[in-house]
Amino acid sequence: MAQLCELRRGRALLALVASLLLSGAQVASRELDVHESCGVSKVVGKCRASIPRWWYNITDGSCQPFVYGGCEGNGNNYQSKEECLDKCAGVTENTTDDMARNRNGADSSVLSVPRKQSAEDLSAEIFNYEEYCVPKAVTGPCRAAFPRWYYDTEKNSCISFIYGGCRGNKNSYLSQEACMQHCSGKQMHPFLTPGLKAVILVGLFLMVLILLLGTSMVCLIRVVRRKQERALRTVWSTADDKEQLVKNTCVL
């Protein structure tokens, strides 16, 4: 009888553990689905089609149109605004964190939704002025039309341009305010503009060229002098020989 009770308790315990594991797997799957479908940013893709689609902007809590290239997208890609809202309406930046806390009672290692990059975020990283603020605007090979801003070091201001959606650089900002916050007055040392760099490079090239020409002239002068010295030695040696022959003739 005691063995039967222990067997039943063991089965009940196994059933409870299996139920908890299944519940945890379902919650984790739901978190991942919400993150991939609503939490990530839009991806235009590398292809060059122009397909109108919708994506959920978790920061604004709204569905917004974009142009999809046709390949290598992600789950945050919907054919209509209604489909986007049905899937993601009400999802916020803290949704996945709240779900993780409810499951574990504390912060978990589930991927968090990326937030907008601010000036404080960049200051916490190793800020590379020449990487984030110096390069010229790059539209890229893709054919989307995203309004962006880049920092012009020669004008010390942010200028708007159209970003194609792929293969850009880090000097590309969503707003003029973000661009100015990141780059205006942030250089940590006297900065050389591209024009000044070109002048310096040309000057260095001319200095090296003059140095090489001067060295060549010195070597040429030395060679000429050596030849002249050898020629003079040859002349004097011939005259001495003639004089010695005359003396020998007189003696005979």
Curated annotation (Swiss-Prot):
GO terms for molecular function: serine-type endopeptidase inhibitor activity. The record marks 48-49, 143-144 as: Reactive bond. Isoform 2 is more predominantly expressed than isoform 1. Disulfide bonds join 38-88, 47-71, 63-84, 133-183, 142-166, 158-179. Residues 38-88, 133-183 form the BPTI/Kunitz inhibitor domain. SUPFAM superfamilies: BPTI-like. Its main location: membrane. Residues 28-197 are extracellular. It is found in: Cell membrane; Cytoplasm. Residues 1-27 form the signal peptide. Glycans are attached at residues 57, 94. GO terms for biological process: basement membrane organization; epithelial cell morphogenesis involved in placental branching; establishment or maintenance of cell polarity; negative regulation of cell motility; negative regulation of cell-cell adhesion; neural tube closure. It is a single-pass type I membrane protein. This inhibitor contains two inhibitory domains. Inhibitor of HGFAC. Also inhibits plasmin, and plasma and tissue kallikrein. Inhibits serine protease activity of TMPRSS13. Inhibits serine protease activity of ST14/matriptase in vitro. Interacts with TMPRSS13; the interaction promotes the phosphorylation and cell membrane localization of TMPRSS13. This is Kunitz-type protease inhibitor 2.
